[in-house]
A protein has these predicted regions:
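Sec-dependent N-terminal signal peptides
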Residues: 4-16
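N-terminus-centered regions that define maturation/targeting leaders and the start
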Residues: 18-172
Length: 172
């Protein structure tokens, strides 16, 4: 009887009660990002981090993915955007690892290096934390985003965001 009541209560929740989730087979949240995903200047290969998507709300029209480095603020005076993809189809389950993140899916935005590609973690010294955040949106943006940090994106698109989820990794 309890399971039946639970199912009824869950079915009464609004569609937006289900929030997008992401994970990576390359590393667990809070752990170290493997070297190959780093920038070529730090011995990496600039291969994009593979991402799994789950629990995308049924009313989502698109997904946006932003990877940034808030620790860069201490070095360059701003949060550094390493990767931004908009208009990822909401039925996408997985983004594969690809050189420079050229996936052929979604719309690549300009990173802080002013290029439309994945730029791997590249701290000049000391360990940095890299945040990868996915947003489910109630619309398609149909444009390339320009070096928007997660905070700026959230401010500009607060009315379009249905849900979000973030994982973090360390890199030295």
């Amino acid at each position: 009887m309890l399971n039946f009541l639970s199912l009824i209560l869950i079915s009464l929740l609004p569609i937006s009660a289900f929030a997008i989730e992401i994970s990576s087979p390359a590393f667990k949240d809070g752990e170290t990002i493997p070297k190959k995903y780093g920038c070529k200047y730090n011995g990496g290969k600039d291969i994009s981090i593979p991402i799994n998507f789950s629990n995308v709300p049924k009313n989502a029209q698109s997904i946006v993915l932003i990877m940034d480095d808030p620790d860069a603020k201490k070095v360059v005076g701003k949060t550094w955007v390493h990767w931004i993809l908009s208009d990822i189809p909401p039925d996408t389950k997985y983004l594969d690892e690809v050189k420079y993140g050229k996936l052929g899916i979604g719309v690549a935005g300009k990173n802080s290096d002013r290029s439309k590609k994945y730029f791997g973690p590249c701290p000049p010294k000391n360990e940095h934390q890299y945040n990868i955040k996915a947003y489910s949106l109630n619309t398609k943006l149909e444009k390339s985003l320009k070096a928007l940090t997660q905070k700026k994106f959230e401010k500009l698109y607060e009315n379009e965001i249905i849900s979000s989820f973030m994982i973090s990794g360390k890199f030295k």
